[in-house]
């Protein structure tokens, strides 16, 4: 499904009941061997169907990160059902679009390695914003630019709140063998909490009031030859997300545009962490990642 209402629209045109239950029953009723349900929505309702599909021997490929970042017991149950039924629940594109991050972590774990630390820039939107901010382009304008370039959500507060990054970090931590909930992640945000209240229109009216403070801080940063990066970190089982200042010798310093980067420190890669870097957002690379998951099932 390419959006939460896509199947419903088809059913309505055919004069059929368009409820989730009908969609579920029809897909299961097809009883097609080696079938795959692909979810490219951001719908919690669609994600709630995964359990039934897996129990009926239907593999699930999800760009939708809601299920994998939901309550740990739900995540664990989906993985367990998939294993018991001999089908796949794959969600590589939940983190880093088409970058091979989750598969790499799985390969390390399955080969006997242990993930000691994860440090990453996982928001293409926020990286774009902090790469664009300058003396000529104030903070509020960079947010609008990210929206115009379709990097951000229609409501950019979703990106600025760090919620999307928290979900991604939770997914990576779980795949690395850590039991983590979204509520366990420490947040160090750069926009005051009251900016996330009220209407979107109110937000756009108020956000220019932050420009002067950001410019003053940016000037200090420039003199120190540092860059801002919104970093997700997992170490010793503790997780956090927040804005950091990184110097020229840091691997995150030169990260361009809306790219993502992840450093994996493991028992094997302890002195020199494994680094994965590249496009972390965009329809093309995300579609390629979804297709790769589908093909990995087709080739089983």
Walk through the language-model features, giving the residues of each:
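Substrate-binding/catalytic subdomain of NAD(P)-dependent oxidoreductase enzymes
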Residues: 132-133, 141-254
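Single conserved hydrophobic/aromatic residue that forms the stacking wall/gate
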Residues: 1-7, 11
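General beta-strand structural signal in soluble alpha/beta enzymes
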Residues: 36-39, 60-63, 89-92, 117-120, ...
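Rossmann-fold NAD(P)-binding glycine/threonine-rich loop
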Residues: 44-52, 65-91
């Amino acid at each position: 499904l390419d959006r939460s209402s896509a199947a419903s629209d088809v059913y309505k045109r055919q004069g059929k009941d368009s409820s989730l239950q009908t969609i579920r029953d029809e897909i299961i009723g097809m009883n097609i061997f080696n079938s795959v349900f692909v979810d490219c929505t951001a719908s919690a309702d669609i994600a709630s169907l995964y359990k039934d599909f897996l129990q009926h021997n239907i593999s699930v490929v999800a760009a939708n990160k809601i299920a994998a970042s939901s309550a740990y017991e739900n995540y664990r149950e989906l993985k367990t059902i998939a294993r018991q039924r001999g089908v796949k629940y794959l969600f590589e594109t939940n983190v880093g679009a088409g970058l091979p991050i989750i598969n790499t972590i799985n390969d390390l774990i399955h080969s006997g390695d242990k993930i000691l630390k994860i440090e990453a820039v996982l928001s293409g939107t926020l990286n774009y914003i902090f790469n664009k901010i300058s003396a000529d382009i104030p903070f509020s304008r960079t947010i609008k630019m990210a929206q115009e370039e379709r990097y951000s959500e229609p409501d950019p507060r979703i990106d600025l709140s760090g919620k999307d990054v928290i979900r991604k970090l939770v997914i990576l931590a779980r795949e690395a063998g850590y039991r983590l909930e979204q509520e366990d992640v420490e947040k160090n945000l750069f926009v005051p909490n009251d900016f996330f209240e009220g209407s979107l229109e109110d937000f756009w009216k108020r956000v220019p009031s932050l420009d002067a403070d950001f410019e003053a801080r940016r000037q200090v940063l420039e003199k120190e030859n540092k860059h801002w990066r919104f970093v997700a970190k997992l170490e010793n089982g503790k997780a956090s997300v927040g804005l950091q200042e990184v110097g020229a010798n840091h691997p995150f310093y030169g990260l361009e545009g809306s790219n993502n980067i992840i450093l994996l420190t493991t028992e094997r890669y302890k002195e020199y962490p494994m680094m994965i870097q590249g496009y972390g957002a965009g329809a093309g690379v995300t579609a390629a990642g979804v297709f790769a998951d589908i093909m990995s099932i087709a080739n089983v």
